[in-house]
Amino acid sequence: MNHFSKKVSVSLMALVMVAMTASAGTNAAKSTKTSGVNWNPVMDAIIQVESEGNPNAVSGKSVGAMQITPILVKDCNDILKKQKSKKRYTMADRYSVSKSKEMFLIIQKHYNPENDVEKAIRLWNGGVKYSQRSTNSYYKKVLAQMK
């Protein structure tokens, strides 16, 4: 497959994923939905790419199934504080898959209100100021896991 065909295939796959997640619905767990999007397929793919599903994975300052950093925990807590929520996450919560998924949803709701699947994946890998180029490989790996 040539380079152009690969790009078209990835783009089409991304569009299909957006359509599928946007229409996924009523059977999805309430805690994994924001504005009608079922984030479970994205989160599950990220978990496979980040840690192969290992909730005890450690790589530098990143830990848990979703490889959460202390900076992300602080960011989630800052967002919750601004929302006047009393809920806060601890560093130990990074080892909990369910709490890691909650943090993912907080980040997406705050930084990705349009619920763009591609942005969600790139944002998770590269942070708020991610670049397209630096997150390309990661984005492709997550999409491949979502097949």
Task: Give the ranges of each region predicted by the language model.
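N-terminal secretory targeting signals
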Residues: 1-41, 140, 144-147
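Extracellular/periplasmic catalytic domains that process cell-envelope and extracellular macromolecules
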Residues: 36-39, 59, 114-117
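Short, functionally critical alpha-helical segments immediately adjacent to catalytic or ligand/cofactor-binding
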Residues: 38-54, 68, 104, 119-127
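Short N-proximal segments of mature Sec-exported proteins
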Residues: 50, 58-75
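Short helix-to-loop capping/linker segments positioned immediately adjacent to catalytic or ligand/cofactor-binding
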Residues: 54-55, 111
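Short, solvent-exposed loop/turn and secondary-structure capping segments
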Residues: 57-59, 134-135
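Alpha-helical segment that forms one wall of the substrate-binding/catalytic cleft
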Residues: 70-123, 128-131, 139-147
